[in-house]
């Protein structure tokens, strides 16, 4: 049975931790509002970029001079899994959820006889990937490469990926991140960014291609020239969008985790306080009994 002193020490420690988690919850709440604003501003551009690329891809796909970034190199043996994560912890299951989805995809690809490599954006998922897939990580970003989240940082990562693709290091690249819906809902998401995957419904893509072919849509200059400029940018936009989604999901997950921690701390303090008061009452009762027994003996 714990002593009064140990219970008092535990209550004091939990109260201190509760103050920290409450402060972290407030900080995460403030950061979340800013992240939501940035994400809301970026989503329409990313969506429109995907629509433009879908249209251009539908028109140019299959042509003899189609770019490798658009149609690939005719093989899909080596798959690069770009796994994002946070640079800080204490954000619930945010990082582990992304890792699990990437892990499941990696195991499925290996079972199909494919070669899997990892490109890790963010610090927290790097160690677990190294431990579970030793020797398969080709790059791990440093904190200064991803913080703060800017389009310039996303462009640098995109340029590195394109150089590695052109050098033949991989054939297909999949991007894993957490799509933000709300404070209570962040969904691990996978998207193929190299070569460019068709967006949306195939029927709509074909209709767009037919419109473009029939002259309903005119391109100046030609589609291939536009693609050579927009394809690298679309990869950077996809990475930037994933980083923004991750940053917002991270703060939402951290806010929720710290709120739960603060509530659990309050419940623990209540239980320990009751236990402390009962022990103290029992000790006082014992002392009174001893005093009365001693008085009667006299």
UniProtKB/Swiss-Prot annotation:
<dbReference type="InterPro" id="IPR023632">
    <property type="entry name" value="ATP_synth_F1_gsu_CS"/>
</dbReference>
<dbReference type="GO" id="GO:0042777">
    <property type="term" value="P:proton motive force-driven plasma membrane ATP synthesis"/>
</dbReference>
<keyword id="KW-0139">CF(1)</keyword>
<comment type="subunit">
    <text>F-type ATPases have 2 components, CF(1) - the catalytic core - and CF(0) - the membrane proton channel. CF(1) has five subunits: alpha(3), beta(3), gamma(1), delta(1), epsilon(1). CF(0) has three main subunits: a, b and c.</text>
</comment>
<keyword id="KW-0472">Membrane</keyword>
<dbReference type="GO" id="GO:0046933">
    <property type="term" value="F:proton-transporting ATP synthase activity, rotational mechanism"/>
</dbReference>
<comment type="function">
    <text>Produces ATP from ADP in the presence of a proton gradient across the membrane. The gamma chain is believed to be important in regulating ATPase activity and the flow of protons through the CF(0) complex.</text>
</comment>
<dbReference type="GO" id="GO:0045259">
    <property type="term" value="C:proton-transporting ATP synthase complex"/>
</dbReference>
<keyword id="KW-0066">ATP synthesis</keyword>
<keyword id="KW-0406">Ion transport</keyword>
<keyword id="KW-1003">Cell membrane</keyword>
<dbReference type="InterPro" id="IPR000131">
    <property type="entry name" value="ATP_synth_F1_gsu"/>
</dbReference>
<keyword id="KW-0375">Hydrogen ion transport</keyword>
<protein>
    <recommendedName>
        <fullName>ATP synthase gamma chain</fullName>
    </recommendedName>
</protein>
<dbReference type="GO" id="GO:0005524">
    <property type="term" value="F:ATP binding"/>
</dbReference>
<keyword id="KW-0813">Transport</keyword>
<dbReference type="InterPro" id="IPR035968">
    <property type="entry name" value="ATP_synth_F1_ATPase_gsu"/>
</dbReference>
<comment type="similarity">
    <text>Belongs to the ATPase gamma chain family.</text>
</comment>
<dbReference type="GO" id="GO:0005886">
    <property type="term" value="C:plasma membrane"/>
</dbReference>
<dbReference type="Pfam" id="PF00231">
    <property type="entry name" value="ATP-synt"/>
</dbReference>
<keyword id="KW-0997">Cell inner membrane</keyword>
